[in-house]
C-alpha cells in the first residue's frame, strides 16, 4: 500500500497485494461484495482486472484507476488491445458506456530546472467521444477533445504549449514531449 487513507468522513477499505489478496482481480471481486460507492484500482495491468473494473462500472460504481500511457487515445487503445480481437467490439461497447473521463499527465522539468510541472490531457465522455470509442475510431478522438475546450477538455499539445508560452518549460522540453 503506497498511501494509507484515514477514515474522516467516510470509510476507506484498502487491500494490499500479497498481504490481503493475491491479485487485483481477487481484490476487486472482494470489494464488490462490500457494495462500495467508489473503487480505486492502483493500476489496471491485466485483462482480468480490466474486465472486473468494467463490470463494476456497469453496475453503477465509480471506478478510478491508473494506466501507464501517454494521452487519452493511447489509454483507450491500451484497454481495448488487452483483449483478443474477437472480444474487442464488446469491450469498446462496454467502455463507451461507462467511461466518464480520462486524465493523462506527463511530468517534466521546469525551465528553471527547479522542480517539475505536469502537462495534462483531459478527455470527457461526451456523446461524440463515446461514439468514436464504440465504433473503433479511437484515432479520431483528438478532434472532439480539441473542440471540447469549453467543456474542460484539453489536448496534451495544447497543455504543453500553454506551459511554454508562460515560460514554465523551455522549447527543448516542449519539443521532446509533444
Report the location of each language-model feature.
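Short, flexible helix-loop junctions that flank or precede catalytic/ligand sites
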Residues: 1-178
Amino acid at each position: 500500500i503506497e498511501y494509507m487513507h484515514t477514515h474522516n468522513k467516510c470509510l476507506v477499505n484498502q487491500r494490499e497485494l500479497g498481504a490481503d489478496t493475491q491479485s487485483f482481480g481477487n481484490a476487486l471481486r472482494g470489494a464488490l461484495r462490500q457494495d462500495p460507492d467508489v473503487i480505486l484500482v492502483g493500476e489496471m495491468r491485466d485483462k482480468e482486472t480490466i474486465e472486473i473494473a468494467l463490470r463494476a462500472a456497469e453496475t453503477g460504481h465509480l471506478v478510478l484507476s491508473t494506466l501507464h500511457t501517454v494521452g487519452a487515445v493511447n489509454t483507450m487503445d491500451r484497454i481495448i488491445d488487452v483483449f483478443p480481437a474477437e472480444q474487442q467490439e464488446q469491450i469498446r461497447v462496454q467502455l463507451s458506456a461507462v467511461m466518464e473521463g480520462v486524465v493523462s499527465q506527463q511530468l517534466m522539468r521546469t525551465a528553471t530546472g527547479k522542480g517539475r510541472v505536469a502537462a495534462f490531457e483531459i478527455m470527457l465522455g461526451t456523446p461524440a467521444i463515446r461514439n468514436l470509442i464504440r465504433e473503433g475510431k479511437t484515432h479520431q478522438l483528438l478532434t472532439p477533445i480539441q473542440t471540447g475546450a469549453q467543456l474542460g477538455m484539453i489536448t496534451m499539445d495544447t497543455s504543453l504549449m500553454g506551459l511554454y508560452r508562460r515560460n514554465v518549460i523551455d522549447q527543448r522540453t516542449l519539443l521532446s514531449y509533444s
